[in-house]
Structures are given as structure tokens and as C-alpha cells.
Amino acid sequence: MHLCYFDENKHGPDNPHFFIGGLLIPDKKALDFENTLSQIAFNFFGARSLIQANELHGKELFHGKGNAKGRKLEERVQVFQDIATFVTNNQIPVRMVCINVERHKNKYQYPMPAYRLGLMLILERFSEYLEQEDDLGLVFGDYEADEVTGAVVDFSEYKSQGKTPMYFGRPLAGYGVFHPVASQPIFTGGRFAGLHGGSL
């Protein structure tokens, strides 16, 4: 089984691209990976406690705000480097979706909301990987009060239909520390591409 963690950014006039993406963690390696991430958090925060104050979120680290406020740039960059090394060395699959929200709205007469479209597409990408690996997956995401109800309905519909409703129509079979880390590829991917995906 793979544990599939996803996160998304907040889009708006200053940030027109909606990013959603995540990591697929093999369950057999989850505890070892958690220990590594706890060490990275300890190196930065001086604590291993699984509390919000010790979460490694891309936005706060990049801007030096929130729980990274007052920390030196070199220290914050080191966390990004450590996470990138961790993901790369462990060959952790990363999947991302980027939607230009205005272009999407203008392309269709009745466009699907960006969050629902992005959720559908990231589930398709997770499913595609799991199918290649001949494995099952368990998906974890944020509790977004304004969007969670629709997302739960989407999950339910995708499950009952056995696949997502459009685009690739990929089949969706059966149905702590990794989720904040899932925000980092989204944040850095958007920044690297110059598409301002960094407002997680």
C-alpha cells in the first residue's frame, strides 16, 4: 500500500495558477521516512514533537514567516535542500497538477471549479502510478472548510463510478509528517516555473 499525501495552494488575482500535488509513500518505508523527516524538523526547530509549531511548510520557510519567522535564510534554504535530498535519495514519487484558473474559466462555458478539477487530476495521477506498481493507495489531504464538502462528494462519486468523469477517465480502484512536506514540491515547483504557486 502507498500513502498518498496531497496539498494545494490558494489562487487569486495575484496568484492565478492553482497547484495541487503530492507524494506517494510506500507504507513499508513510512516509519523510516518519518524518522528522517523528524530529524530534519529537529535540526531546524530543535524539537521532534508532531505539533503545528514544528511543521515544515514551504510558504513559511520561503518567506521566513509563521514558525520560520526570524530564522536565517541559510537555515531555511537548508530545510528545502534537506527535503529535496530526502525525496530524491528515496526516489519518492511526486505528482503535480497546475491549472491556469483564468484560462480554464475562459475555455469552457461551464468550467469545473479549479479545486475539483485539480483534485480529479491528482487522483488520476496517483491512480496511474498505483496501477503501474500494482498496489493500493490511501489518500490524505487538508481539511479545507470551504471546499472539503465538495471534495468528499467528489471522492464518493469517483468511487461509485469507478473512475474520474473526464480528461483521462482513469479508473480509481476500490477505495503526520508527510502532509506538510507535500506542500514543498508545490511551493518550489511554482516558484521555479515562475508561476507563483508558492502561496500555500
Model regions and ranges:
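Phosphate-ester processing/binding pockets and catalytic centers
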Residues: 1-200
